[in-house]
A protein has these predicted regions:
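Helix-loop-beta substructure at the N-terminus of cytosolic sensory domains
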Residues: 11-53, 61-64, 199-213
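Signal-transducing coupling segments at domain and membrane junctions
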Residues: 89-112, 289-299
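Regulatory sensory and allosteric helical modules in signal-transduction proteins
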Residues: 60-103
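Amphipathic alpha-helical "output/dimerization" segments
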Residues: 120, 137-158, 215, 306
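A short, aliphatic-rich beta-strand micro-motif
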Residues: 111-119
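Histidine- and acidic-residue-rich, metal-dependent catalytic cores
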Residues: 169-327
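Short beta-strand-to-loop transition segments that serve as allosteric relay/switch motifs
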Residues: 58, 126-137, 239
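Signal-transmission linkers at sensory-effector interfaces
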Residues: 1-22, 30, 163-173
Length: 327
């Protein structure tokens, strides 16, 4: 019996999505060595914003931490509406592009590009970009191969995003029950999650954060107080100051949140979702303090997970800058 090594076996493993994209690019380069970059941008339908998400570049990517509204990029908006791919055949077209993202790509020396829109059951998710070092590289044979790899990458990305969204939806449903008891508004959670994303982006260079991490913080941050489901109403809804004993019970919501998330991950079979520890850390450690006086573990400084620090700042910032009459 002949044995053969599966060149894409990493796609069946729980490695981060970017590692899977890099490996896929390496396999593609065995056939199309002039493809020097594969990148994925995802679409936020609430804000009509297109955000960089993944790239296969071994170096610093020219479009890391970049976003734009779909209406500000008419050619991409047309692809979204029509569902068709786009070919830019030569460097002149790239260099003359008026949009910042096109100019950045041109300055990196990429000479041509092929863009595929991502759809799942008719719902638009974003784009896949194949950038070439050679002009006029996209003949029919090449395009057939890129279509195959593009759909593979699309399924890989959408499958992971759907898994994360299902997890977030499940926990959000439980979290909504909390907000029926504790009147934390959905607008507050939406604002603070976007503040968290802005903070993470501003720290990206200092902490070498990639777009995938930033998106996880954005998606998971509204779930920080899920543990309040385990707090009795007479404490959670008490209008006056809590007693010392009541404060002790209230502070257990951080640990309870971590326990609830662990149970949901196990029950839904989502333990293997990459970066799920970001969610665990946000729920458990968002009340820690830089000086070590927080809870539940009394962590201090850099021992507090970065995502928990980001969410804590975003939460407090919104509380201080928004009128919330129930507070």
């Amino acid at each position: 019996m002949l044995e053969r090594h599966d060149t894409l076996e990493c796609l069946n493993q729980t490695s981060p999505l970017r590692e899977k994209l890099v490996k896929t690019h390496m396999v593609l380069n065995n056939h199309l060595p002039f493809i020097k970059r594969i990148a994925v941008a995802i679409y936020d339908p609430k804000t009509s914003v297109l955000k960089t998400y993944l790239h296969s570049s071994g170096k610093e990517d020219p479009l890391s931490h970049y976003q734009t509204t779909i209406k500000d990029t008419p050619s991409l908006e047309a692809l979204m509406k029509q569902g068709n791919p786009r070919i830019i055949k030569n460097k002149v077209t790239v260099e003359r592009g008026r949009h910042e993202h096109t100019q950045r790509i041109g300055r990196e020396g990429y000479a041509a590009s092929y863009t595929l829109p991502m759809f799942y059951n008719g719902v638009f998710f974003g784009f896949i970009f194949f950038n070439s070092s050679e002009t006029d590289a996209f003949n029919e044979t090449t395009l057939e191969q890129l279509d195959l790899y593009g759909h593979l990458i699309s399924l890989m990305v959408i499958n992971e995003i759907n898994s994360v969204q299902t997890l977030v939806a499940a926990i959000s449903t439980a979290s909504h029950m909390t907000h029926l008891r504790d009147p934390e508004t959905g607008s507050h959670l939406d604002r603070m999650s976007r503040y968290a994303r802005l903070i993470a982006k501003s720290l990206a260079e200092q902490y070498q954060l990639d777009d995938e991490y930033i998106e996880r913080v954005f998606m998971f941050s509204p779930l920080h107080d899920i543990g309040k489901l385990g707090i009795p109403d007479q404490i959670l809804l008490k209008p006056g100051k809590l007693t010392e004993e009541e404060q002790t019970i209230m502070r257990t919501h951080a640990t309870k949140g971590r326990e609830m998330i662990d149970n949901m991950l196990a029950n839904f079979g989502f333990d293997s979702i990459p970066d799920v520890d970001i969610l665990r850390n946000i729920a458990q450690f968002h009340h820690e303090s830089i000086n070590g006086q927080g809870y539940p573990a009394g962590l201090s400084g850099n021992s507090i997970p970065l995502e928990a620090r980001i969410v804590a700042v975003a939460d407090v910032f919104d509380a201080l800058t928004s009128r919330r009459p129930y507070k």
